[in-house]
From Swiss-Prot:
One GO term describing the cellular component: membrane
Gene name of the encoded protein: UTR4
Taxonomic placement: Eukaryota, Viridiplantae, Streptophyta, Embryophyta, Tracheophyta
Protein name, UniProt field: UDP-galactose/UDP-glucose transporter 4
Stretches the record annotates as Disordered: 316-349
Membrane spanning residue stretches: 23-43, 56-76, 115-135, 140-160, 167-187, 205-225, 248-268, 293-313
Top-level division of the source organism's lineage: Eukaryota
Functional note: Sugar transporter involved in the transport of nucleotide-sugars from cytoplasm into the Golgi and/or the endoplasmic reticulum.
Protein family per UniProt: Belongs to the nucleotide-sugar transporter family. UDP-galactose:UMP antiporter (TC 2.A.7.11) subfamily.
Gene Ontology molecular functions: antiporter activity
Annotated keywords: Antiport, Membrane, Sugar transport, Transmembrane, Transmembrane helix, Transport
Species assigned in the record: Arabidopsis thaliana
InterPro entries assigned: SCL35B1-4/HUT1 (IPR013657)
Protein's cellular compartments: Membrane
SUPFAM superfamilies noted in UniProt: Multidrug resistance efflux transporter EmrE
Major place of residence: membrane
Amino acid sequence: MKTNSEEQMIKLFGIPLSDKPRWQQFLICSSGFFFGYLVNGICEEYVYNRLKFSYGWYFTFAQGLVYIALIYMYGFRTKQMVNPWKTYVKLSGVLMGSHGLTKGSLAYLNYPAQIMFKSTKVLPVMVMGAFIPGLRRKYPVHEYISAMLLVIGLILFTLADAHTSPNFSIIGVMMISGALIMDAFLGNLQEAIFTMNPETTQMEMLFCSTVVGLPFLLAPMILTGELFTAWNSCAQHPYVYGVLVFEAMATFIGQVSVLSLIALFGAATTAMITTARKAVTLLLSYLIFTKPLTEQHGTGLLLIFMGIILKMVPDPNPNPKSSGSGQTPGKLERVKFEKEDDEESRPLV
């Protein structure tokens, strides 16, 4: 076993993070995440709403190809892998299942209903963390309350601007619930991989997940005919590919930043950050376009800020397996499997 000084350090595009103070780690990773997904939102608004191109599977496939090219340019090669391919087969299966169920649920749920469900993502992430072998995270009560405040606040803020009420369908509810469970499993599985094998890099996880995941996209594209329709439409408007490449480059920064957050702070904290990002994006749209803010908007914002502040309260009884703090500061520590019970020592995949 390697000593702490020999352990792999987490880096974000060459910036060493493991030896920095926690607040600097958080600021750097969050900034990369917010930048990437703010650009992503602008590009999606342009492509989906302005150009009326709703080819989600095809665009995701194109984005994956850009990811692979960028990671290859960054210098990653498969010989640098420290995890077996089967790890990423399961990871990609969950990822594509979540994407498919979320996309499919739109046929049965209207936008406000889907927002309500997707906003609760942080809660199943926290619950699922207790059942992942090698992770077994337990969170203090105040973190559950913090997550609830954040979720309720975001729902109130979002629905304040909804022109229609949430419309529920049992099939849609089952699909979006399945997507949430897969999302929860995905984040915790990524955290467990980083925890059980600290030499895992963000580039390895993103590259392997993308390479394994792309074939999963071919079946729905071919079966729905989207592959040929999207190809013909984009051939008539080739500038769309320029937008897609630019968006993929930005979201690449966001994705690597998210994986860094998971490795350093854990899946639950990362889920709270991604949830808070939605609130920040919505608030910016109101400030930039000077939309009127109602009392319900104010109530939602108040609950969101209360949840964020409560999240910052330190745990009075710290436990290495509790909270969503991810890896310890400084050099990453390996999980000592010999000190775990049989269930904890069971292979992750």
